[in-house]
Amino acid sequence: MTTTENVSIPGAPGVNPSADAIISIRNLRKWYQVGGGFMGFGDKIYLKAVDDVSFDIERNKTFGLVGESGCGKTTTLKLLLGLETPTAGNIYYEGEDVATMSKAGKSEFRRSVQAVFQDPWSSLNPRMRVRSIVGEPLEIATTMTKGQIATRVGDLLSETGLNPYQANLYPHEFSGGQRQRIGIARALALNPKVIALDEPVSALDVSIRAQIMNLL
């Protein structure tokens, strides 16, 4: 929805996060300027991709964000992951505002909140072998040896319905459903506290969907 707004974008006041939630979203907004305001004159025109959204994600719970196509679900996910900067609002992780976290705090947040994206074709680096794609988080965020990482990668591939011997292949050698399973294996590598998923089983065969959901 595109609307005309004043130059000033109102910022909703922050509300304290829930004590029971691992993630709290408060008054979150993401507005994109799509016109107007030329040379500082006139009203700017904004596309309100996300407008005043608030919710809590409790520990050890499954939380679903449901809405029609184009209503802002994927943008909300990107804001949660720090891939987009909010126009206004707050994102809390374990009670702490992510925007004001220390460097160490943000590193812990990135380790603890992983993602699986909807498009398995663009979410994997085509120049990397699967063993590197799945093992990269372990190389960066742990002190595991190469042998331990290789074992962990094999286990993750098995758990997501892939053959560990496929670790030496490249993404283009897999089907779309298999690529999505690689993305899920990568997201599970660090045993995260939160996994944010953008329609994660939409590209999978019916026979594998239940297996993946049970694994998650």
Q: Where do the model's predicted regions map?
A:
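Conserved ABC ATPase signature
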Residues: Y170-F174, Q178
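Hydrophobic anchor residue at the start of the ABC signature
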Residues: I184, I212
